[in-house]
Amino acid sequence: MTDETRPALFETASMEVRVSMMKEMRAFIDERHMTPEDAAEAFGVTQSRILELVAGQFKLFVIDTLVDMADRAGMVMAVKVSN
């Protein structure tokens, strides 16, 4: 792997993690029939951030933010890394 391909591969992996987390968070919201206001309170963010999440705007979120939001809402997280 060259230095030129490393950032692209990292961005792809990061994107996949963010998209996966956001899908789970949207499911959490849907399963509980939460309004944007309810979800914002549960995740500890503004309603506009919830609308961005529900719209799948993954480029607006970093993994750390999504982890913190999920934790505030009481979601259980697991990380699996394999080779």
PLM features: what roles do these ranges have?
Residues 33-51:
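Short alpha-helical DNA-recognition segment
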Residues 29, 40, 70:
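The alpha-helix within a helix-turn-helix
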Residues 81-83:
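Short, charged recognition helix plus adjacent turn
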Residues 21-24, 49, 65:
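Hydrophobic alpha-helical segments typical of transmembrane helices
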Residues 1-24:
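N-terminal flexible/basic segments that precede or flank functional cores
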Residues 63-79:
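DNA major-groove recognition helix of helix-turn-helix/homeodomain DNA-binding modules
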Residues 54:
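DNA major-groove recognition helix of helix-turn-helix
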